[in-house]
Amino acid sequence: MKRLLFIVLAMIATITSFAQQKDVTSFLGIPVDGTVLSMKQKLVSKGFVPKKVGTNEFLEGEFNGCNVNVYIRTNNNKVYRIMVADNNTVDEAQIKIRFNNLVSQFENNKRYIPLDKYTLSDEDDISYEMTVHNKNYEAYFYQVPDMEKADTLGLQEKVRNELLSKYTEAELTNPSEEITKEIKNTAIKIGTELMLMKPVWFKIVRVNGEYFICMFYDNEYNRSHGEDL
């Protein structure tokens, strides 16, 4: 929460310039956006090799020290997800170590904010819980908003419009201590909404008694929100 507050206060301080591009989730520095073709080209430039098995298309390569398959998902011809799946399966003990290592890496990366604590303990019986209770083992993180790319003027306007439902222009121009606190709280709320558009999460997948990790880099701006209904 302290990190989020710092980010939002920095956002308030830097609300002075136009955005050059949309701030979306990135994978290896590549925005999760655009067309499948452009995304493939960018991934190939990172060393990934296109593969096709039947009708299933993906790219193969190395990511974070593991051999992986990368899948591109779209909505209305716009990329909204990069899915990264381990190429090799491991046993229960090894997957717990891998899961916890990933949690630690994300927790110690200043570019991410966790929603909760996700570390598995020695007592966690993954096989039993997944088989009997259909439990999901997932960890959710969010990429910190890039204020050089964020639409700062748009954010300022959003904060202002929300506050105008409670206060007058004059009160916002010369805010009291109470209104100043309300301005910060509103900015934190809107900053959190911005952050939630950039989720990166992973889960344990079980297949035939073996396990692997699937990671998801999602661009919530491009996901389906029922507009085609």
What are these regions (language model features)?
Residues 57, 79-80, 211-212:
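Hydrophobic residues embedded in beta-strands of well-ordered beta-sheets
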Residues 60-105:
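Mid-chain, structured segments of secreted extracytoplasmic proteins
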Residues 20-50, 88-229:
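Non-cytosolic coordination micro-motifs
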Residues 42-64:
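A compact, surface-exposed functional segment
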